Design a protein with these regions (language model features):
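Cleavable N-terminal export/targeting peptides
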Residues: 1-46, 64
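Short glycine/proline- and aromatic-enriched beta-strand/turn motifs that initiate or cap beta-hairpins
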Residues: 36-84, 88-92
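Outer-envelope beta-barrel architecture signal
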Residues: 43-51, 69-71, 80-82, 100-106, ...
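Transmembrane beta-barrel strands of outer-membrane/channel proteins
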Residues: 51-57, 77, 86-88, 108-112, ...
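Transmembrane beta-barrel domains of outer membrane proteins
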Residues: 54-56, 76-78, 97, 140-144, ...
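Extracytoplasmic loops and strand-loop junctions of Gram-negative outer membrane beta-barrel proteins
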Residues: 55-58, 121-124, 153, 207-213, ...
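Outer-membrane beta-barrel transmembrane domain signature
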Residues: 81, 92, 158-240, 244-252, ...
Length: 274
């Protein structure tokens, strides 16, 4: 089970996608893992590998930027100590068994996020200084039960571009349909501090023009909801799919760089496990 993950973080879009891509990438992959049998002690010490290719279509929040459609190479490596998938690596910490049906998992995560923009990306960004993505690191916790799964994650910008912090939380439940198909609705919230919002959506004094007033970002919380699915043909071949909608916080919508109140993303991929 993986509720939260970086970022996403795979292309140069706004920071609001970080939780989204994580759901559509890492979450999709680990859902497929759940279809397989639970590993015994001997199997848990081995390393599993997976390779694949996906495509994502996402609506950007910035004015004048349409949908961003791009291929996504997929690489997965997992054993009892680490889980690497896409732009994120998790270093697993000891878990806590609360009962036969409840477990707490902990981890240290590092992920790359490609958020940001260049001034040539849209007319509204002409004359703006480049906003860069970078590496984020932090800790995560996941509580799993028979009824619902909960995840929480704290991340900090270790690249020093925004010098910001994020807190992501999410709830999900997975339904099995036969032996091959999983469907997982999920909801979540992503809090971003004032430094993060100001870096990606603020307008500095030297960037002001007649249709782009100065804007200082404040901390904000986006609300996200979506569904992902995994169809596993056998233990090697899986098809991954996902859809997510994000309601942007007022602190983002009020930016003169933004012309919408929601964003959305659609994902489809194929993964081969060795």
């Amino acid at each position: 089970m993986s509720l939260i993950s970086p970022l996403d973080s795979i292309s140069s879009a706004s920071v609001s996608r970080m939780a989204a891509v994580s759901v559509l990438a890492v979450g999709l992959c680990t859902s497929a893992t759940a279809l397989a049998q639970e590993p015994n002690d001997a199997e848990s010490s081995t390393t599993t590998w997976g390779l694949g290719l996906g495509v994502m279509s996402e609506q950007e929040p910035y004015a004048g930027i349409g949908r961003d459609n791009q291929p996504l190479p997929l690489l997965e490596v997992e054993n009892r100590y680490i889980h690497l998938f896409g732009p994120e690596i998790e270093f697993k910490l000891p878990s806590l068994d609360i009962s036969d049906s409840q477990e707490l998992d902990f981890g240290i995560v590092v992920q790359y996020d490609g958020s940001g923009y260049e001034e040539g990306d849209a007319d509204i960004l002409d004359g703006m200084s480049e906003r860069k993505g970078g590496f984020w690191a932090g800790a995560k916790m996941e509580w799993s039960s028979d009824f619902v799964d909960f995840g929480a994650e704290w991340l900090a910008d270790v690249s020093g571009n925004s010098k910001g912090q994020l807190i992501n939380v999410g709830l999900e439940r997975t339904w099995d349909f036969g032996e091959h198909f999983l469907l997982t609705p999920h909801v979540g919230a992503s809090w971003q501090d004032a430094k993060t919002i100001d870096y990606y959506f603020g307008v500095r004094d030297d960037e002001v023009r007649f249709d782009r007033p100065a804007y200082a970002g404040e901390s904000a919380t986006n609300i996200e909801a979506g569904v992902r699915g995994v169809y596993m043909f056998d233990k090697h071949h899986s098809v991954l799919m996902g859809v997510e909608v994000t309601r942007l916080a007022d602190e983002i919508k009020d930016s003169p760089l933004v012309d919408r109140s929601t964003t959305n993303s659609v994902y489809l991929g194929y993964l081969y496990r060795f």
